[in-house]
Amino acid sequence: ASCLVGSEMCIRDRVELRQRPWNRNYVGTHFGGSLFAMTDPFWMLLVMQNLGRDYYVWDKAGSIDFIKPGRGTVTADFVLDNAILDTLRSATESGEKYLHWFDTDVHDLSGDVVARVRKQLYIKRKPQR
């Protein structure tokens, strides 16, 4: 979906994970692997779709920090604006690789942060043919 950040257009995706018996851990909260997995592909997909076919985009690294137990439905928002895309384009215009970290908070229905996820992407402009 499109959105505005200040006066800039941006792209926004929201992911939702409902708690079920198969994603619940031994103590009855969301399994940490499910919280990480719900966020896994989205930064790479958003960047690939918006930079276009002239770029290599790969997941490089990731981490998760568990803030509080996640219960019920949890959500994560991904907002990619033109300023980030401009940074990625300018950092790779000479053909060098660029590593960029993206941060995403996972919230419960009360709006409390239950986890902070970081994903690092490898981005490189493809050679001209």
Name each model-derived stretch:
Residues 7-8, 22-23, 41-54:
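Short N-terminal helix-initiation segments at or just after the protein's N-terminus
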Residues 1-6, 10-11:
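Single conserved hydrophobic/aromatic residue that forms the stacking wall/gate
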Residues 23-42, 56:
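Hot-dog-fold acyl-thioester-processing enzymes
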Residues 15, 60-62, 76, 100-102, ...:
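Hydrophobic residues positioned within well-ordered beta-strands of beta-sheet architectures
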Residues 70-71, 81-129:
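HotDog/MaoC-like acyl-thioester-processing domains
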Residues 12-19:
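Short, aliphatic-rich beta-strand segments
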Residues 22-25, 123-125:
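A short local loop/turn or secondary-structure capping micro-motif enriched for an aromatic residue
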Residues 46-83:
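Hydrophobic beta-strand-centered segment that forms part of the acyl-chain substrate-binding groove
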